[in-house]
């Protein structure tokens, strides 16, 4: 670690312990921290409006299959991961982060809105991929900005708040979509998704300006320094993180499963789609609440137990999605468990990176994390979508649950590596 960002000591439980009076008294909930969370809220509102409508748009309007939906999501996730991995080192330099964050949020907003003009599946795939590439460009920069704004004692709470904002946007987006598609139709709803994204650009620009003023101009190398990242103890925990992401089914497939289950229960296509979107909003509401609470939990107990709990919740959730002939109560429980799981997992993973690395390496670290996440998401979306369409939804969700079990068993790597990283 450098003198610029000294490591906080770790207790036996893996939680960060007070390093001194200054660290204890330092406030963490500031305007810039709130601005980062607001950017996540507005951006997620926009692209989750599209995510909620996409299954019906592809399958009902463009007459595509579940495998096409999985392929679109999988390719987009894969490209987002490459963008995170490639641009993460560029975010090592504090004064470059603002441009990458603002530009990424702007690109996400514009490309998401353009999905509405698509008349073929390949066009949806292109615009979705462009939006997700922009998300990949912005993410390491945003996370590095956020880590630079708070004390190491408050990393969990800060990232929990950011994840809460993200998930609250994922509540507002589906709710807006559910109301808009019944009044103005699917395509106009897709067009309007650009508006919240533009608010996100303003919010992240203001937050980044504050972070830029508080850090020196000099930054880290413009490449991923795997040697330093390995010595910081961050490579081994990527194994259970990868297993988790290999089991992290795209939310569009969860919405599709709910829609089909509700249709089999007697609802029309439109009614089933609207109801499924509303249940998905509950998923995201729990994700927001649990992320905020989970951030405090991570600061007290460390990422390991929080991550393991997330994987366990997903195993149970996938059982609910796999069971055939289920009505809305079972689907609601399954969505709630999955939402809680993602709220805990993302907070734990981001906190792990922020604790392990100094500021001049965090862009690379967050890029590496994002690359692992997106590579796993690509494989999960593609494979589960194929199994879903060719064999059965039961097989697809059983496959995903198996990977979550692997992540649960491998969660011990997060604690061991965290302790090693503290000594560097």
Question: Where are the regions that the model predicts?
Answer:
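Helix-loop boundary and gating motifs at the non-cytosolic
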Residues: 23-77, 235-265, 269-272, 276
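Residue-level signature of mid-helix packing/kink "hotspots" within the transmembrane helices
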Residues: 77-85, 170-171, 284-292, 377-378
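Intracellular juxtamembrane helix-capping segments at the cytosolic ends
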Residues: 137-150, 344-357
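Helix-to-loop junctions at the C-terminal end of transmembrane segments
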Residues: 83-96, 181, 289-302, 388
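C-terminal ends and interior cores of transmembrane alpha-helices
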Residues: 106-119, 312-326
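Cytoplasmic membrane-interface "Motif A"-like loop-to-helix N-cap segments
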Residues: 93-105, 299-311
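Symmetry-related core transmembrane helices of the 12-TM Major Facilitator Superfamily/SLC fold
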Residues: 188-205, 396-412
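Juxtamembrane intracellular "pre-TM" segments in multi-pass secondary transporters
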Residues: 5-30, 209-240
């Amino acid at each position: 670690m450098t003198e610029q960002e000294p490591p906080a000591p770790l207790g036996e439980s893996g939680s960060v312990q007070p390093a001194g009076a200054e660290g204890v008294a330092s406030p963490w909930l500031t305007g810039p921290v709130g601005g980062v969370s607001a950017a996540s809220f507005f951006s997620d509102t926009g692209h989750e409006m599209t995510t909620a409508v996409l299954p019906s748009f592809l399958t009902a309007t463009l007459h595509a299959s579940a495998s096409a939906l999985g392929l679109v999501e999988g390719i987009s996730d894969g490209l987002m991961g490459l963008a995170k991995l490639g641009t993460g080192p560029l975010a090592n330099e504090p004064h470059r982060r603002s441009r990458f964050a603002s530009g990424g949020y702007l690109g996400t907003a514009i490309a998401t809105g353009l999905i509405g003009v698509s008349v073929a599946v390949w066009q949806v795939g292109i615009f979705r991929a462009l939006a997700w590439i922009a998300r990949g460009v912005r993410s390491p920069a945003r996370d590095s900005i956020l880590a630079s704004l708070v004390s190491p004692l408050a990393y969990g709470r800060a990232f929990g708040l950011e994840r809460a904002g993200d998930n609250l946007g994922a509540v507002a987006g589906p709710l807006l979509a559910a109301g808009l598609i019944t009044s103005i139709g699917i395509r106009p709803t897709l067009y309007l998704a650009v508006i919240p994204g533009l608010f996100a650009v303003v919010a992240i620009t203001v937050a980044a300006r504050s972070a830029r003023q508080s850090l020196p101009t000099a930054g880290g190398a413009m490449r991923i320094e795997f040697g330093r990242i390995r010595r910081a103890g961050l490579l081994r925990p990527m194994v259970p993180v990868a297993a988790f992401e290999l089991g992290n089914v795209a939310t569009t497939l969860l919405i599709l499963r709910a829609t089909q289950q509700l249709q089999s229960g007697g609802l029309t296509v439109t009614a089933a789609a609207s109801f499924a979107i509303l249940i998905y909003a509950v998923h995201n509401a729990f994700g927001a609440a649990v992320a905020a609470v989970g951030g405090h939990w991570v600061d007290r107990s460390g990422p390991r137990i929080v991550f393991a709990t997330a994987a366990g919740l997903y195993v149970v959730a996938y059982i609910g999605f796999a069971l055939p002939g289920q009505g809305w109560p079972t689907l609601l429980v399954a969505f709630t468990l999955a939402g809680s799981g993602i709220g805990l997992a993302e907070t734990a993973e981001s906190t792990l990176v922020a604790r392990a690395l100094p500021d001049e390496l965090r862009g690379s670290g967050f890029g590496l994390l994002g690359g692992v996440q997106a590579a796993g998401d690509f494989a999960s979306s593609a494979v589960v979508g194929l199994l879903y369409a060719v064999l059965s939804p039961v097989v697809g969700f059983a496959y995903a649950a198996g990977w979550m079990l692997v992540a649960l068993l491998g969660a011990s790597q997060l604690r061991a590596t965290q302790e090693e990283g503290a000594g560097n």
